[in-house]
Curated annotation (Swiss-Prot):
Keywords: Host membrane, Late protein, Membrane, Transmembrane, Transmembrane helix. It is found in: Host membrane. This is Uncharacterized protein F165R. Belongs to the asfivirus F165R family. Coiled coil: none annotated. It comes from African swine fever virus (isolate Tick/Malawi/Lil 20-1/1983). The chain crosses the membrane at residues 16-36. The keyword Transmembrane helix applies. It comes from the Viruses. Induction: Expressed in the late phase of the viral replicative cycle.
Length: 165
């Protein structure tokens, strides 16, 4: 006869598995509609503090946070651009997953709205990958700033090619 406590543990682990699968689909769908259908990010911010406040409102999501210094701005103000992870899970996401090119185009389109007067080549870009919450799903590498900058350069070149298709 099976041990009753073992049965309870098995039942709990099945419930946990089902719960994590449901969470995955909930966040996947939510990110899809936020990031792709509406062609939007969660916001454009002038400080990391504003950015962090917004991230606290969405504790279940991963983000890629782009920080731009716009050369057209006389005061060279830093602008922080917050993008949900499904759109761009890491700066190299589009290289790993070619069917994400549609999302990459949307991201570039949105960024172009912010920096209409500047071409991609003229942007000064730095990037931080931010993980406010850990899921058992896609795991992005934690990049150093140098690695991230290099990855972003490659991404922008790749995305620039996609935009011209």
């Amino acid at each position: 006869m099976a041990n009753p406590s073992k049965r309870i543990i098995n039942k709990k682990s099945k419930q946990a598995s089902i719960s994590s699968i449901l969470n995955f689909f909930f966040f996947y769908i939510m990110e899809y509609f936020v990031a792709v259908d509406n062609e939007t990010s969660l916001g454009v911010f002038t400080s990391m503090e504003q950015c962090e406040e917004t991230m606290k409102q969405y504790p279940g999501l991963h983000y890629v946070v782009f920080k731009y210094m716009c050369p057209a701005d006389a005061e060279n103000t830093d602008v922080v651009y917050l993008i949900p992870s499904l759109t761009l899970h890491t700066p190299m996401f589009v290289d790993h997953c070619p069917n994400r090119t549609k999302q990459a185009r949307h991201v570039l389109k949105k960024i172009n709205l912010v920096f209409e007067e500047e071409s991609i080549e003229n942007w000064k870009v730095s990037v931080n990958t931010v993980f406010p919450h850990v899921h058992n799903r896609l795991t992005a590498p934690k990049l150093s700033i140098d690695e991230a900058n290099e990855a972003v350069e490659k991404f922008l070149i790749q995305a620039g090619r996609l935009m011209s298709l």
